[in-house]
């Protein structure tokens, strides 16, 4: 019963916002204060990207620079960590004057590293005091990253590569390489393998492997099994793994519903190799405007390392896309 008391408010909030979004989308005017602010930010991004492009060399007016930006607020709640929230940003500026392969990326790179995870893995902060729900220092450091990216795709081999050189917070100069390959076995079944490695002068080693197997069972649904392996070596070495088996439904209006089972653990000494398992449900749709998204998620995981049985965890992401 106690678990239901924690879960019910989350369900009510998610359902109410979803219903309100349906009504508001129908009444969209595209002329409110929020719309004007969104337009202003987009125009500023466009202006900045073209100013940078012009400064770098002679430009082609038929191929202007472009920029994209995602601004997110991640909110999480459970009975142990209580409520936490974290602002996150991730952006990209394409610069045609530097050839089509080069761009500038900035913001929290974990948004890209974990973009293949359908469910929420991890938490907003590490080692956050129980009486706090926000860590300005950690949030600022995670978002303080900028790099020049060289991208290439070998179509004959189906391989895509990104190589970043940049600067993170605290003077952390880093290089990052991402290689991915997608193999279409049949019209309905495909495999995608992605390898990410980053080395920083302060953050040291980060290595992550993503493996996906996807089966399309209809025009609007597919079944996915996603496995990741992760290794970090900063002050200490940490290794972990996770596997999500889920089904996703795609609806009109950029709406998706996913549900499945997650398992995960650690390979480190004194840690459970099979630490967590449980079901999750996540939903995503525009709310109020086509550029504003809401993504609630409810999961029921355990935690053997901390002697915790299965408990409800609520997660909500509000995201503005520019």
Write out the residue ranges for each language-model feature.
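Cleavable N-terminal export/targeting peptides
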Residues: 1-50, 56-60
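Solvent-exposed N-terminal domain segments of exported/luminal and surface proteins
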Residues: 92-95
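Surface-exposed strand-loop-strand hairpins of Gram-negative outer-membrane beta-barrel proteins
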Residues: 75-87
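Outer-membrane pore/translocation modules
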Residues: 25-34, 97-242, 253-257, 261, ...
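Extracytoplasmic
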Residues: 64-68, 86, 99
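Outer-membrane beta-barrel "beta-signal"
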Residues: 297, 308-322
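Transmembrane beta-strand segments of Gram-negative outer membrane beta-barrel proteins
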Residues: 59-77, 159-163, 190-193, 257
